[in-house]
Amino acid sequence: MFRLSQYMRELLHPTPLTAPRKPAGPVVIWNLIRRCNLTCKHCYTTSADINFPGELSTPEIYAVMDDLKAFKVPVLILSGGEPLLHPDIFAISQRARDMGFYVALSSNGTLINPSNIKQIAAIDYQYIGVSLDGIGQTHDTFRQKQGSFEASLAGIRLCREHDIKAGVRFTLTQDNAHDFEGLLQLMDDEDIDKFYLSHLNYGGRGNKNRKDDAEFQLTRKVMDSLFEKSLSWEQQGLHREVVTGNNDADAVYFLHWVKRRFPERAEHIRTKLEQWGGNASGVNVANIDNLGNVHPDTFWWHYGLGNVRKRPFSEIWMDVNDPLMAGLKASPRPLKGRCGECYYQNICNGNTRVRAQQMTGDFWAEDPGCYLLDEEVFA
């Protein structure tokens, strides 16, 4: 995850360089339930509006939470499917808050409504992310349900009315890139706190729809626009949070943008980006699915590391006998091709390994989703 707005602030208000701090434990994205009221084209969990057998019970979830707390996991992102369909979502969320976790909810927003907004507000989630993949019909087509855009937007508005930090998550593909500028305008019109741009990753239905992955020139155009919008928001003092995910080449592309626009700040930004270190799958980001299987991140559902019913998460996470985990935790990673030769490995860290694995069968092959030109990779 590349926190673009953080580095925009560094451009305008540089802070002293400090020693990098290693997070105590990984951020855990937890798919509590696979059931969902939508069937989105790019869903990595391939969810549907049916019950999936074998999911962790609430007592099992609590036991895992105890282990995560002892392992110093700082953040729980509760996801699905649609997490609001879990019968005990509020009890689980409240327990997580009481234990001191930073707790976020990853929702499609359609089930946030007047009947439950007070319960949601009472939990005091630190953040609620709502997926919007375009304006109006574009979103409805991606979500495969008419009216879902208006329902999701209504959920965001309810969150804003109840002082809950809410944000938009947008997955970029060729089929919805035309609505990107409209979503940025929506951020202004609705005074939304956060914008998260997710590049299409090759997992679940996203793997089946990778032919819709935005072409590289389109991706570059979108990123250029996002850089300028984020800069404008910072210059206006709006301080909206802007984050991108699933393509750590964004950080390198941003550095080249800084070299052109703010050359006097380029070395400072480069050092800050190196301290961040790029892709954190298997290191500072983890996933637990609805069945209790542990994965390096949410797009590795086809590759399990172990199950929390059989071994504690803390034990699974530190086991480097698994070849994928050994490589993800290695520094540098055993990258090949362009990624192995890239001048900016210490910023990107090999980008998203699941795309390489899905396309070539090799964990460590070059990432086919890297949109950088050769002259941007090797200089």
Which residues are covered by each model-predicted region?
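Cysteine-cluster motifs in flexible loop/terminal segments that predominantly coordinate metals
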Residues: R333-V377
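Short, basic/aromatic recognition patches
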Residues: H268-G277
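Short Fe-S-cluster ligation motifs
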Residues: D67-G80, A365-A379
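N-terminal pre-core extensions flanking Radical SAM catalytic domains
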Residues: M1-N51, D66-K69, F313
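Radical SAM/AdoMet-radical enzyme domain recognition
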Residues: T58-E215
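Short, small/polar residue-rich loop motifs at catalytic or cofactor-binding pockets
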Residues: N279-G282
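Short, acidic, Ser/Thr-enriched surface-loop or helix-capping motifs
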Residues: I288-D289
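C-terminal accessory region of radical SAM enzymes
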Residues: Q217-H268, N293-Y343, C348-N349
